[in-house]
Design a protein with these regions (language model features):
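Conserved ABC ATPase "signature" region
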Residues: 1-11
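Conserved ABC ATPase signature
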Residues: 15-19, 23
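Hydrophobic anchor residue at the start of the ABC signature
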Residues: 29
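A short, proline-enriched helix->beta-strand linker immediately N-terminal to the Walker B motif
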Residues: 34-38
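Catalytic Walker B motif of ABC-type/P-loop ATPase nucleotide-binding domains
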Residues: 40-43
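ABC ATPase "signature
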Residues: 99-100
Length: 152
């Protein structure tokens, strides 16, 4: 059942060393799910994975939260992964620097860069365009939002 929840049922009998990094992470998450937790804490679950593996893990985690109602605490340095969160907490040296929705946090491009974090590319581009005089909303954080704003 847990393997099915993370899309790994077809690999139940595969040797673990033949799985990709993303598949191994999904199997590890399935192991956690078998315990039926109310909350899962994932610390850098996509570290050392290729972009496809990262997408697989983010998709799996979103599904666990939305479909199974499991609370996810997701620690990452990849700001594009944090876009999928309901709430983002930015910490610096063990202290909360700021928190809010992804729009509230990632619209603070300059503040993020000051503490060594990169905002999503769309937020950075929108910020630079605003600095050059182009009128754009301050809460643009995704590629789709940026494209839509530029086409108006």
């Amino acid at each position: 059942m847990a393997l099915a929840a993370v899309g790994m049922s077809d690999y139940a009998k595969h040797a673990p060393h033949l799985l990709s990094g993303g598949q191994k992470q999904r199997v590890a998450i399935a192991g956690l799910m078998a315990l039926e937790p109310a909350c899962i804490v994932l610390d850098e679950p996509t570290a050392m994975l290729d972009p496809q593996g990262r997408k697989e893990i983010v998709s799996t985690v979103k599904s666990l939260n939305k479909d199974k109602g499991i609370t996810i605490v997701y620690i990452t340095h990849y700001m594009t992964e944090a876009l999928a969160a309901d709430r983002v907490v930015v910490m610096e040296k063990g202290h909360i620097r700021f928190m809010g929705t992804p729009k509230e946090v990632f619209s603070r491009v300059d503040e993020l860069e000051k503490i060594g974090l990169e905002a999503p590319l769309a937020a950075k581009v929108a910020s630079e365009l605003r600095k050059s005089g182009i009128k754009l909303a301050k809460d643009i954080i995704t590629d789709e939002e940026l494209a839509q704003a530029l086409c108006q």
